[in-house]
Amino acid sequence: MKTEKRYLVPGDYMADPAVHVFDGKLYIYPSHDWESGIAENDNGDHFNMKDYHVYSMDDVMNGEIKDHGVVLSTEDIPWAGRQLWDCDVVCKDGKYYMYFPLKDQNDIFRIGVAVSDKPYGPFIPEANPMKGSYSIDPAVWDDGDGNYYIYFGGLWGGQLQRYRNNKALESAILPEGEEEAIPSRVARLSEDMMEFAEEPRAVVILDEDGKPLTAGDTERRFFEASWMHKYNGKYYFSYSTGDTHLLCYATGDNPYGPFTYQGVILTPVVGWTTHHAIVEFKGKWYLFHHDCVPSEGKTWLRSLKVCELQYDADGRIITIEGKDE
């Protein structure tokens, strides 16, 4: 399906959006790309982001978007090394908790927490990362019953292949072919929102026969960019396939899964990465994502986009064409 799309921040490079509705207003929490001069490589060193802005709006497709400025930077974070990648924010009891991936001073990705009294920040970081945290792409789900869940993980530069059973390996292992694909992770958060309340679990995605997706199934298996939303009582776990550049989704009956693969949300865009948020606002559903058209294909200089997202009568997401030409 081709659909009208809008670039939201044409004057800057913003990507990897997390999007939520707080107090009737829509807030966007993107990563902030810039020209760092670092050569492109499979570890993603060229994605050398160092701060976050927050944006808000009342009218998605036509309204003004407000930039609330820098709300957190690596200079504010005591344990910071480099590469402040994509974050997410959740509200509990009037406090706003930002979860962010950042390499520590040993060049290992950890997940940190920063807190604000306002959805637009500024966010004050904790002195240390979450205990036992690793990898990238935190996405937080408020299940509406007092429980909050954090999804995380990403391959290659995201370092997920360096871990098994939540323990670091001596060397990274990437499965191949018919071996089971490396899954995303999920854990319930502690009451104070600062730690895992339990050991992170695998987010298993099943094929049509009820079998876990394999590493060789690169157009369906998880790579990075976890997101969760709920529609008509079903849990929709969506994600990027990374090196095949698709946004896909799977559905399940609870936040832990397992989830059964359903299809493609967004076909490849211009640029290597694809990352997204799905949110309902004022009776319509939207897909926030990014591409590299304004930077003429520089994959480390991405631009924030949005379009409407639709479901068919059976609750399947109607696939959106990533390229507009």
UniProtKB/Swiss-Prot annotation:
Chain positions of site Important for catalytic activity, responsible for pKa modulation of the active site Glu and correct orientation of both the proton donor and substrate: 137
Top-level taxon of origin: Bacteria
Keywords: Carbohydrate metabolism, Glycosidase, Hydrolase, Multifunctional enzyme, Polysaccharide degradation, Xylan degradation
Cross-referenced InterPro entries: Glyco_hydro_43 (IPR006710), Glyco_hydro_beta-prop_sf (IPR023296), Glycosyl_Hydrlase_43_Enz (IPR052176)
EC number: 3.2.1.37, 3.2.1.55
Inducing factors: By xylan.
One Pfam family named in its UniProt record: Glyco_hydro_43
Catalytic activity: Hydrolysis of (1->4)-beta-D-xylans, to remove successive D-xylose residues from the non-reducing termini; Hydrolysis of terminal non-reducing alpha-L-arabinofuranoside residues in alpha-L-arabinosides
A GO term, aspect molecular function: xylan 1,4-beta-xylosidase activity
GO BP annotations, alphabetical order: xylan catabolic process
Signal peptide location: none
Annotated catalytic residues: 16, 224
PANTHER family per the UniProt record, alphabetical: ENDO-1,4-BETA-XYLANASE (PTHR43772), PUTATIVE (AFU_ORTHOLOGUE AFUA_2G04480)-RELATED (PTHR43772:SF2)
Entry's family note: Belongs to the glycosyl hydrolase 43 family.
Protein name: Xylosidase/arabinosidase
Species assigned in the record: Bacteroides ovatus
